[in-house]
Design a protein with these regions (language model features):
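Hydrophobic transmembrane alpha-helices and their immediate loop junctions
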Residues: 1-217
């Protein structure tokens, strides 16, 4: 159930980038068949298979991953719809993750009430109830982590693209150009923010815990 929850979070994130771009007239994702709900179309060998598998094998406290990036022609969208449309496309994946987290939290509250579940009765659940609870809780958690992480204004994350195009709307291309140059170091940036404890705690884990508690309170 952990893997299923993660795949729904990461694949939906990418599909929403492509879908929002399509709504603004860019057919890149559509023509590449990347708006498909078939998960095979979106799997990245490292981010969708190997990394989650390794985290499971080593019993990591969390799973993390990513799907293949959806092709989007931001130049076309800027020329046809303006830079604010690119801000919307950049944040579409994050919006999906946060919206799904809220929806899953709502379903969790309803399920807990209907099943009479509380912290003391978790061990009394049958296999199917435990699978449902695991899926819901992990789904909330993974979507919050992805939403928080991708909101960071650091290339190549979505937050940097949104900030760059927002600056472009106000006639400044500096941020967009600088972020574009820094994307070559993207893997290193991701590694630093995920695996250096002080940074991951402050920028990812603490905000995620706060939102998680808020949704399930």
């Amino acid at each position: 159930m952990k893997i299923l929850a993660l795949l729904i979070a990461i694949i939906g994130h990418e599909i929403m980038h492509g879908l929002s771009a399509f709504l603004f007239g860019d057919r890149s994702a559509k023509d590449a068949n990347r708006l498909s709900l078939n998960p095979i179309k979106h799997l990245d060998m490292m981010g969708s298979v190997l990394l989650p598998a390794l985290l499971l094998i080593f019993q990591a406290p969390f799973l993390f991953g990513w799907a293949k990036s959806v092709p989007v022609d931001m130049r076309y969208i800027v020329s046809q719809k303006g830079s604010l449309a690119c801000v919307a496309v950049s944040l579409a994946g994050v919006a999906y993750n946060f919206t799904l987290a809220v929806l899953l939290a709502f379903i969790t509250h309803l399920s807990f009430q209907k099943l009479g579940i509380n912290a003391l009765s978790i061990n009394e659940l049958n296999l199917y109830q435990l699978a449902l609870v695991t899926f819901l809780i992990q789904g909330i958690l993974y979507n919050l982590v992805l939403g928080v992480f991708n909101s960071l204004p650091i290339p190549p994350l979505d937050g940097s693209k949104a900030l760059g195009f927002l600056a472009l709307h106000f006639k400044s291309a500096f941020l967009l150009e600088w972020f574009s140059k820094m994307e070559r170091y993207g893997f290193l940036v991701v590694f630093i923010f995920l695996f250096i404890p002080p940074l991951s705690e402050f920028f990812i884990h603490a905000p995620t815990r706060f939102l998680f508690s808020l949704l399930l309170s």
